[in-house]
């Protein structure tokens, strides 16, 4: 059913009040706090209509109304005013990105911390599945006599290393030679393309350095296994306990239990936002997972070039300060791209 301007203004006033107070909103409150030019009785009648239309609900213990998921959805899509970040909040996000960082996962963790502090909700972030990650470089670096460090770098900026044991007779120049061979054969391949024929080609090229083939190969394999594990970051879950929606011990326990399931969080982020460059808002029952039916999730992807590198999201109660979260996500997204491209380069073809 169509909402006329009067109903829209009343619905916006109720939701704005409820977001800030967490208390059911009555007609007298709306009449007193908002200059709508309407009597309390008129507002009461309009609120009854909005409830009948599914935009508001009435808790059993209160004469006031609270927004339904449908009400929040209409608010977010059509009524919500834009917010601006404070200079302090902008500085917080910029500082998180400007810290000396040489790996994408470090950047993501720093940004997650900043977003959680600014929004006062929980932030979640994930790097994508790595089967299609392209190997950018392999280095074998001498550490001490009898030990070397295998370092694998992917096109998405992920860096993993593995300490290996080697013969004490192996010279540094041998390790440079081995690094060159591994780079020649592996650079530009996806993780899924590294197979036995490729390994045999490396073996044929090793020549006098055959004795360190297996240790280095084991080190590369170990790095790939580390890369292949999805990386998920969660910050500020404890923030949720500050909201009355989570004052119930059982409700809080269910939510915190959900937040430690990293595989589940990774799936939530992947399912919530598969479209590049879009910001997606899921409200209450729009979420598939039962423990999130009373939460809202706002997610976006971040990219380098035209490649989606990962997803970041904010989760809070449905009584979320949506405009504030969207302002933070929009600013973060605008700055994230340049920092991601600095870390991993604009050419993500792996060639």
UniProtKB/Swiss-Prot annotation:
A Gene Ontology BP annotation from the UniProt entry: negative regulation of DNA-templated transcription
InterPro entries attached to this UniProt entry: GAF-like_dom_sf, HrcA, HrcA_C, WH-like_DNA-bd_sf, WH_DNA-bd_sf, WHTH_transcript_rep_HrcA_IDD
Gene3D superfamilies cross-referenced by the UniProt entry: 3.30.450.40, Heat-inducible transcription repressor hrca homolog, domain 3, Winged helix-like DNA-binding domain superfamily/Winged helix DNA-binding domain
GO molecular function, one term: DNA binding
Described function: Negative regulator of class I heat shock genes (grpE-dnaK-dnaJ and groELS operons). Prevents heat-shock induction of these operons.
HAMAP family: HrcA
Descriptive protein name: Heat-inducible transcription repressor HrcA
Organism whose genome encodes this protein: Acetivibrio thermocellus (strain ATCC 27405 / DSM 1237 / JCM 9322 / NBRC 103400 / NCIMB 10682 / NRRL B-4536 / VPI 7372) (Clostridium thermocellum)
Highest classification ranks of the organism: Bacteria, Bacillati, Bacillota, Clostridia, Eubacteriales
Annotated gene: hrcA
């Amino acid at each position: 059913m169509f909402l006329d301007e009067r109903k829209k203004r009343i619905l916006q006033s109720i939701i704005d009040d409820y977001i800030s107070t967490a208390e059911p909103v009555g007609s007298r409150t709306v009449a007193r706090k908002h200059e709508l030019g309407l009597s309390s009785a008129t507002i009461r009648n309009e609120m009854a209509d909005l409830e009948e239309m599914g935009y508001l609900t009435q808790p059993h213990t209160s004469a006031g109304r609270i927004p339904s998921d449908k009400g929040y959805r209409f608010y977010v899509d059509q009524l919500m005013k834009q917010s601006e970040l404070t200079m302090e909040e902008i500085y917080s996000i910029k500082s998180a990105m400007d810290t000396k960082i040489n790996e994408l996962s470090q950047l993501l963790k720093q940004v997650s911390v900043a977003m959680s502090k600014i929004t006062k909700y929980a932030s979640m972030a994930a790097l994508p599945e790595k089967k299609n990650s392209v190997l950018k470089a392999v280095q074998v670096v001498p550490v001490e006599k009898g030990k070397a460090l295998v370092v694998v770098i992917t096109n998405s900026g992920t860096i993993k290393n593995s300490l290996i044991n080697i013969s004490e007779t192996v010279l540094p120049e041998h390790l440079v030679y081995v690094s060159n061979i591994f780079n020649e054969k592996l650079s530009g391949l996806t993780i899924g393309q590294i197979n036995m024929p490729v390994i045999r080609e490396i073996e044929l090229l090793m020549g006098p350095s055959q004795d360190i083939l297996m240790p280095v190969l084991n080190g590369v394999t170990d790095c790939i296994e580390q890369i292949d594990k999805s990386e998920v970051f969660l910050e500020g879950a404890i923030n949720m306990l500050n909201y009355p929606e989570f004052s119930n011990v059982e409700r809080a326990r269910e939510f915190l239990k959900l937040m430690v399931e990293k595989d589940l969080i990774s799936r939530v982020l992947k399912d919530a936002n598969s479209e590049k460059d879009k910001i997606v808002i899921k409200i209450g029952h729009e979420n598939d997972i039962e423990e999130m039916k009373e939460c809202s999730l706002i997610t976006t992807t971040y990219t380098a070039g035209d490649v989606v590198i990962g997803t970041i999201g904010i989760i809070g109660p449905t009584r979320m300060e949506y405009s504030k979260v969207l302002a933070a996500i929009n600013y973060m997204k605008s700055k994230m791209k340049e920092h991601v491209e600095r870390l991993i380069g604009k050419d993500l073809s792996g060639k």
